[in-house]
Design a protein with these regions (language model features):
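A ligand-binding cleft/hinge motif common to bilobed small-molecule-binding domains
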Residues: 108-117, 234-252
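His/Asp/Glu-enriched short active-site or ligand-binding loop at hydrolase and phosphoryl-transfer sites
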Residues: 194-219, 239, 269-270
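A short, structured surface patch at a secondary-structure boundary
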Residues: 40-111
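Extracytoplasmic substrate-binding proteins
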Residues: 34-41, 110-188, 213-215, 266-297
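Bacterial N-terminal signal peptides that target proteins for export
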Residues: 2-19
Length: 297
């Protein structure tokens, strides 16, 4: 009896098939193009990066964006490849970018490895929470898009505007600065708040306020006692919709908030998250708006 030998061809996974097809078509470049281009081949990852692309009048270059890229409103008409920290290689490859402009922290690393293997040029834009940091972002994006001169002019103007806003805030006496608690979430009745080293900490200081919490870095859940002890004059939250919205009414029901000056006075400021924390082209205006909300015109 003879045995029949069956040869099986390995089945290509969707990702391998897409990657192979893309490479065979030569759609991916190996480096950012020099000189301004008219082709739509750029994927923008991160709300501030996308804002910068539009501010440089390079939106015609965009082929897609990530979920955090919601301004200007017309950006939301672009294909959405997902949240910047949870990108799938398939989603990115499906829009066939030649260049990815990304804020720091995009990932996961496995996805970035696949994109590098595909020969996609990836330019990572550092995240810093000051005027010079915004200028660096703009100049790096401009250089990658071949519009360095335009980027330098935009960066210089924004640095000047933000430094002027900061000078006005610096003139406020320390004793007159309001203590501000930035609350990211109140899920389960527990307050997730900003310490130091965050965009929230920086924007509060630039607007002339004082972060009520400086005992830790980043974002952490705080005990009720710690929140009450922080004694914020104002609660600052992102303006959200639906189940994630934090309202003055919901905050007033929390035992940690009620005894604080902010709780007693119902002092809650709500601002759009990207506008408030993006540290991009609109940040000088956001600083001025937050300062007005804290102290009046």
């Amino acid at each position: 009896m003879h045995r029949q030998t069956i040869t099986r061809t390995p089945r290509a996974t969707p990702l391998r098939a897409l990657l192979a097809a893309t490479l065979s078509l030569g759609l991916f470049g190996t480096a950012a193009q020099s000189g301004e281009s008219t082709s739509a081949d750029v994927l923008s990852i991160g709300g501030s990066v996308t804002e910068i692309v539009y501010a440089l009048d390079q939106e015609h270059r965009l082929v897609a964006r990530d979920t955090t890229s919601t301004y200007p409103p017309e950006a939301t008409t672009l294909p959405d490849v997902g949240y910047m920290r949870a990108l799938s290689a398939e989603g990115v490859l499906s829009v066939a970018p030649k260049l990815v402009l990304s804020e720091e922290g995009a990932g996961p690393p496995a996805t970035i490895d696949v994109l590098n293997a595909a020969g996609i040029a990836i330019v990572t834009v550092p995240d810093r929470y000051d005027a010079e940091g915004i200028g660096l972002k703009i100049r790096k994006v401009g250089a990658a898009l071949g519009v360095a001169d335009k980027a330098d002019r935009l960066a210089s103007r924004i640095e000047t505007d933000l430094n002027e806003a900061a000078r006005k805030s610096d003139a406020r006496a320390d004793a007159d600065r309001k203590r501000v608690l930035f609350v990211l979430s109140t899920e389960g009745g527990s307050i997730l708040a900003s310490g130091t080293g965050t965009a929230a900490h920086a924007i509060i200081g630039l607007a002339g306020g004082k972060n009520a919490v400086t005992g830790f870095e980043g974002y952490k859940r705080m005990t009720d006692e710690a929140v009450t002890t922080a004694a914020p004059d104002v609660i600052l939250v992102m303006d959200r919709e639906g189940n994630h919205a934090i309202t003055a009414e919901s905050l007033s029901t929390l035992p940690a908030i009620r005894p604080t000056p902010a709780g007693r006075n119902g002092a809650v400021i709500r601002m759009n998250g990207l506008y408030l924390l993006g540290f991009g082209p609109r940040t000088a205006k956001a600083v001025a708006d937050l300062s007005t909300a804290l102290y009046g015109s």
